[in-house]
Amino acid sequence: MAKLALIEREKKRARLVAKFAAKRDALKAIVEDQSKSEEERYEARLELQQLPRNANPTRQRNRCAITGRPRGTFRKFGLARNKIREIAFRGEIPGLTKASW
């Protein structure tokens, strides 16, 4: 089980990403727009740098919903590989069976 502080930190990052998503997208559009003047693009770049670091979606880490484990997490289930294995063996994931050939 991951420390509760690490799980809460990820939740805080998710809230920041959601809060600043629209502003971030607007500023990135200005920075990438070649028809804007260099001064406007420069100002937008500076303003983009002033946003909180954790507002960047690439800083988020997928974690297991049960254990908080940061590695080996399947996006489809939102669970770590070992928890998927446990739940699948109990037959609680519909359509998921152990491979055999």
Curated annotation (Swiss-Prot):
Keyword RNA-binding found: yes
InterPro entries to which the protein is assigned, alphabetical: Ribosomal_uS14, Ribosomal_uS14_bac/plastid
One BP annotation, GO: translation
GO CC annotations on file: cytoplasm; small ribosomal subunit
Signal peptide limits: none
Chain coiled-coil ranges: none
GO molecular function: rRNA binding; structural constituent of ribosome
Record bears the keyword Calcium: no
Membrane spanning stretches: none
Alphabetically ordered keywords of this record: Ribonucleoprotein, Ribosomal protein, RNA-binding, rRNA-binding
Function as written in the Swiss-Prot or TrEMBL entry: Binds 16S rRNA, required for the assembly of 30S particles and may also be responsible for determining the conformation of the 16S rRNA at the A site.
Family per similarity comment: Belongs to the universal ribosomal protein uS14 family.
UniProt subunit comment: Part of the 30S ribosomal subunit. Contacts proteins S3 and S10.
PANTHER family xrefs: 30S RIBOSOMAL PROTEIN S14, SMALL RIBOSOMAL SUBUNIT PROTEIN US14M
UniProt name for this protein: Small ribosomal subunit protein uS14
Encoding gene, per UniProt annotation: rpsN
